[in-house]
Amino acid sequence: VLFRSVMNEGRIQQIGTPQDIYNEPKNAFVADFIGESNIIDGIMHEDRVVGMYGKKFPCLDGGFQPNEPVDVVIRPEDIDIVPVEQGQLTGTVTEVTFKGMHYDIIVDFKGFKWLIQTTDFSPVGARIGVKIDPDGFHIMKKSRYSGMFGDYSSYSSEYDELNEGPEEGNEDEE
């Protein structure tokens, strides 16, 4: 078994297999470092029940204090788009980018932007529902990195900046 470590400023943040680090990041820094994530403030009501946006969701995590504030990590590929009436949450599509094998869809949920990666197209302006299975929620204790990476509100105007590339002139022109 091959173990890896994720470090920040000379300090080990997490040691584990690549799969363990990806699927169960220990803090917001690790979650952001290893890939795109939606990181949302939540409350762990009890073992296997997390709250966000005033709603309760089943999850697989436990070992937290009742009503403990937590960071909830939801990977973009773990979110399913469903009809509004079937959604655990509903939001509005604000951006759609075709990526070849999938779409990157930015959805506004009560002022917070989430990234969803899906093969299903939804047009800008559409009201959609989303469904997240219990194993799609990854619950982390709050840490000094909490809030540094957004309520993946990094998927607002920052997303455009990431996709635009350098603003210099066309290098092919002479």
Tell what function each PLM region has:
Residues F3-K55:
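Internal alpha/beta loop-helix hairpins
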Residues S37, R48-E174:
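Non-catalytic connector elements of ABC transporters
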